[in-house]
């Protein structure tokens, strides 16, 4: 029950963040609260890790977020320069985001499974 409530609160915060595009302060607050709700959602799973494993996992998460953002930004500029993507920018952008997030999720899951065995 607790996880369901937190899940719907995460969706609500994401919805507020998308709807309030012109209000930057409200959008920033919604993003921070969403991050807190995500941590609450995974609270029980985080208890299985040691402090060292959580530190390593946090560093890897921050590193992969930076890499994922870099891949998405460079992919967007690459798509704007090439004529091949003319008319397909939306589909190519969505595929770029899905592929980069999938790769980062795969790497983070592999690291997480290896740290659970420690």
Swiss-Prot record:
InterPro entries: YoqO (IPR025621)
Primary subcellular site in the record, as a coarse category: membrane
Sorted UniProt keywords: Cell membrane, Membrane, Transmembrane, Transmembrane helix
Keyword Transmembrane helix belongs to the record: yes
Membrane topology label: Multi-pass membrane protein
Record-level GO cellular component terms: plasma membrane
Subcellular location: Cell membrane
Pfam families, sorted: YoqO
Coiled coil, from the record: none
Membrane-crossing residue ranges in chain numbering: 5-20, 25-42, 53-73, 83-103
UniProt protein name: Uncharacterized membrane protein YnzK
Provenance organism: Bacillus subtilis (strain 168)
């Amino acid at each position: 029950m607790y996880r369901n409530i937190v899940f719907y609160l995460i969706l609500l915060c994401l919805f507020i963040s998308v709807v309030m595009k012109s209000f930057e302060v409200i959008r920033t607050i919604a993003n921070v609260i969403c991050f807190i709700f995500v941590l609450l959602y995974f609270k029980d799973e985080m208890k299985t890790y040691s402090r060292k494993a959580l530190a390593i996992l946090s560093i890897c998460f921050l590193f992969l977020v930076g890499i994922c953002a870099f891949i998405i930004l460079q992919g967007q500029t690459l798509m704007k320069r090439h004529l091949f993507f003319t008319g397909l920018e939306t589909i190519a952008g969505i595929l770029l985001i899905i592929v980069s997030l999938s790769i980062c999720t795969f790497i983070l899951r592999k690291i997480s499974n290896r740290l659970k065995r420690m």
